[in-house]
Amino acid sequence: MNAWEVNFDGLVGLTHHYAGLSFGNEASTSHRFQVSNPRLAAKQGLLKMKALADLGFPQAVIPPHERPFIPVLRQLGFSGSDEQVLEKVARQAPHWLSSVSSASPMWVANAATVAPSADTLDGKVHLTVANLNNKFHRSLEAPVTESLLKAIFNEEKKFAIHSALPQVALLGDEGAANHNRLGGHYGEPGIQLFVYGREEGNVSRPSRYPARQTREASEAVARLNQVNPQQVIFAQQNPDVIDQGVFHNDVIAVSNRQVLFCHQQAFARQAQLLANLRSRVNGFMAIEVPATQVSVSDAVSTYLFNSQLLSRDDGSMMLVLPQECREHAGVWGYLNELLAADNPIRELKVFDLRESMANGGGPACLRLRVVLTEEERRAVNPAVMMNDTLFNALNDWVERYYRDRLTAADLADPLLLREGREALDVLSQLLNLGSVYPFQREGGGNG
């Protein structure tokens, strides 16, 4: 059956700031306390979405979350009106204010893990929301992510949305950032590669930085998504590269159809894994980048592998990269050698995503891949699909509501909270989402 990969990109939120909240993510921690530009960040993301849509790649948008997230501050013991809560937390515990104001939901590669209908036992598209429990600021995302996904994939006959796994370390799940699908045409059954960093009883794990994904979580997600057990492989990420800042697998590997583009040190027992894939995926091709050409450190600093590998109609592929790759002589030299070599990658497309990159999120972090048949695509909420009209409407919306300068101190401004709620009210109408945000359901209005 014909099917297409649709990229659902996260729209950067109004409180995008640099707080260094993500231990193990070296870009995040190294840019701590810099001044951010939320308006520019959102527009950079929108330009990528629109450019890819114009090239014929189906593209959609997932909206930001409500931030600062007052309900969690109340759970932490701060009381009074919303404005009083903000004032108290800013004075008594400003680190909590930064956490509940994080714009991290924009990295929707961590929103959920997706199983296309060709791979599932019941023939539905399944999405399991990620619990993201390794980081406090990200663990807050799951309930609203679930509401948003249900508003976008709202046809229950076609889509099954599963709640996040229990919020315990044993079941740490980071979503599609640790998941790859390999195979032939998108509409054919594929092999799902779940990548984990640790498992109970296995001493092989990183020592410097945390392994956020567990094998136990990956196995549970595969069950929830009803993936045919014959189409699943579980593989461990190399603990040594996690300790070098590879906090998700999509920082060291990316797949598309029959191609796996990865660093030669990406996986534990890599030769064994590639042999397994070769035996199970017709025409499988591994493009392994040697450490002698690109070090793990350079891969992390340029986000070479946090790229999008997209199929064109003629069967060739395009690699979507952040500008940092072009600015690194060694990485750019390797990429031009790659273009000249015998493989399906025929084009490099470079985007300026500096605002997201400085917080540790490249092109692949910003998108959730969902393979859909034509019938399934028609069942998606049409208001989120990128086109000229939506692009212009979202740009105008960003221009109206987003600040062009934000520091950690600005997060205590009650006006920022009101601006954000008004903006999300307007956006949820624009995208035909209904009342997906807690402040809407509580009748909080714009106050």
Swiss-Prot record:
InterPro entries: AstB_sf, SuccinylArg_d-Hdrlase_AstB. Pfam families: AstB. Its EC number is 3.5.3.23. Pathway: Amino-acid degradation; L-arginine degradation via AST pathway; L-glutamate and succinate from L-arginine: step 2/5. Keywords: Arginine metabolism, Hydrolase. Substrate binds at residues 19-28, 110, 137-138, 212, 250, 359. It catalyses: N(2)-succinyl-L-arginine + 2 H2O + 2 H(+) = N(2)-succinyl-L-ornithine + 2 NH4(+) + CO2. One of its GO terms (molecular function) is N-succinylarginine dihydrolase activity. The active site is at E174, H248, C365. One of its GO terms (biological process) is arginine catabolic process to glutamate. Belongs to the succinylarginine dihydrolase family. Homodimer. Catalyzes the hydrolysis of N(2)-succinylarginine into N(2)-succinylornithine, ammonia and CO(2). PANTHER family: N-SUCCINYLARGININE DIHYDROLASE. This is N-succinylarginine dihydrolase. It comes from Escherichia fergusonii (strain ATCC 35469 / DSM 13698 / CCUG 18766 / IAM 14443 / JCM 21226 / LMG 7866 / NBRC 102419 / NCTC 12128 / CDC 0568-73). The lineage of its organism: Bacteria, Pseudomonadati, Pseudomonadota, Gammaproteobacteria, Enterobacterales. The gene is astB.
